[in-house]
């Protein structure tokens, strides 16, 4: 079985939001390689005019800094974060959006090929050889299914808004379009199905709704080699208070 981890999917969402909404208020990304996290936490304290280097002894300061982080960083108010480190901790945020591992519908077969690079790494290598060998891994084809959750209750606490939700849908639909590489080939989204509830606490269990979407190989197809080899069946008979939305 092939796996796409939750952190892989969230990384691609973060990357899309960063490039698509660069400079827009509230769309900064906390989890990236520009600065140490503790430095960003201290910057939050300074932006709020709070006393620094108290190591979380002032609970009000931690709360104010946490709210500042949620307001300014899309990924924190979306996915949550543990920010309890350093001299200026910002507490812990439970994110309203959670994503499961993506799992392949059918078993996949990872393959490996050998490549040659027409350059050497060091001067000492140059005396002995002109090329270097490398390897690339790939999967000929695989269809993966992942499920996720949006908690309206937790969204109220982090400030995750309807506008943020639309940005999330856009990011999920387009995240692979700006992340192409030879190894991932034509990786793309094929379906995005949303169950929208009428109440904050939900109108039906998520497992019941997920079961309404099934994926199967087309009749006569033994080994799937493309999206066209599959059929997606959707039971559109929704429980009361649940609306089915097909974003793709």
Q: PLM features: what roles do these ranges have?
A:
Residues 1-248:
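RNA-binding basic/glycine-rich loop and surface signature characteristic of RAMP-family CRISPR effectors
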């Amino acid at each position: 079985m092939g796996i796409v981890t939750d952190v892989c999917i969230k990384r691609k969402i973060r990357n899309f939001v960063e490039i698509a909404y660069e400079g827009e208020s509230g769309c900064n990304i906390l989890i990236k390689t520009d600065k140490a996290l503790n430095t960003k936490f201290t910057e939050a304290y300074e932006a709020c005019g709070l006393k620094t280097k108290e190591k979380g002894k002032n609970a009000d300061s931690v709360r104010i800094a946490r709210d500042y982080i949620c307001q300014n960083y899309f990924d924190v108010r979306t996915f949550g974060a543990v920010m309890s480190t350093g001299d200026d901790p910002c507490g812990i945020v439970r994110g309203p959006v959670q994503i499961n591992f993506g799992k392949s519908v059918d078993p996949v077969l990872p393959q490996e090929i050998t490549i040659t690079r027409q350059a050497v790494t060091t001067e000492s290598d140059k005396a002995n050889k002109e090329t270097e060998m490398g390897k690339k891994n790939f999967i000929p084809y695989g269809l993966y299914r992942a499920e996720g959750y949006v908690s309206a209750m937790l969204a109220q606490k982090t400030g995750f808004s309807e506008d943020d939700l639309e940005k999330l849908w856009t990011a999920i639909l387009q995240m692979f379009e700006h992340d192409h590489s030879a190894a991932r080939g034509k990786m793309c989204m094929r379906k995005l199905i949303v169950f929208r509830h009428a109440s904050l606490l939900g109108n039906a269990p998520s497992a019941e709704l997920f079961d309404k979407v099934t994926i199967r190989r087309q009749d006569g197809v033994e080994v799937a080699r493309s999206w066209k080899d599959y059929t997606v069946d959707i039971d559109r008979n929704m429980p009361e208070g649940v609306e089915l939305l097909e974003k793709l």
